Amino acid sequence: MADFTSSLHSQQLALTRYLRDPDGYSPPAGMNPVRARVYLDLVLNNLLGLLGGTFPVLVAVLGDAGWRALVRRFLRDYRAQTPRFGEVAREFVDFVASLEDSPGHEHPWYPFLPELAHYEWVEMALQQLDAAPLVASDAAQLLDRPLRLSPLVWPLAYTWAVHRLGPGNLPSEAPEQPTLLLISRVPSGEVQFSQVSPLAWRLLQRIEQFPDMDGRAQLHALAAEAGASDVASFVADALVLLHQLHEQAAVGVAAAPVFRLLS
């Protein structure tokens, strides 16, 4: 029995090595090469289909042959940290990011590919996120209460203009200014992308960083960061922005603490 188990394990190991790297390993001894090839094509095509739907721009940028080579390399070299089929795309983003220092020559490479992969993955991640929108709050309390960022709203910053990349736009140098985006899931379930100003992006980031700070303190701290010479005017303009974000349900007011009387 022990010999059988050991033999089975050896066969399984040989098969998985072949499926990961058919150029480096042969099918298990005694296995029909034609059948082994069927398994190889099945695994690779399933992975191509799974990832291709999440990264359509990446596929278009690399072309069919380049995309196939990248996915084959992912299968060969990367060791996923989760067995969950639905999280393979997140693992693929990490894999592409890991190639920055050693892109290799098996497929085309552009320095923006890691950010493009992340940008495309974000849409799926936010669609699948198990989170509820903020509870409606009173705009009159925006200055006096701590603020909250909706879990369905993600402020993101990219070195590259990821929303403009495609087969017809393959820059070799990043723009001077970062691309600041607001990714949000609306009630219909659709994920929307919008470009935001540095002021709006930093305000949203601060709300995440300093959840105990009330709105007034947030705006004054923002004015100090910006080096505003006219603080009152800056805060007034920022308050208009804060109200807009509140109307969009991107930002809300923290619930007031509940105090219970001791009996």
What is the predicted function of each stretch?
Residues 1-129:
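N-terminal, charged low-complexity regulatory/assembly segments
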Residues 76-201:
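Hydrophobic packing positions characteristic
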Residues 206-211:
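Short helix-to-turn junction characteristic of helix-turn-helix DNA-binding domains
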Residues 212-224:
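Short acidic, hydrophobic short linear motifs in intrinsically disordered regions
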Residues 224-238:
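Short, positively charged loop/turn segments that connect secondary-structure elements
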Residues 237-249:
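Basic amphipathic alpha-helical segments that dock to polyanions
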Residues 246-259:
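A short, conserved structural fragment
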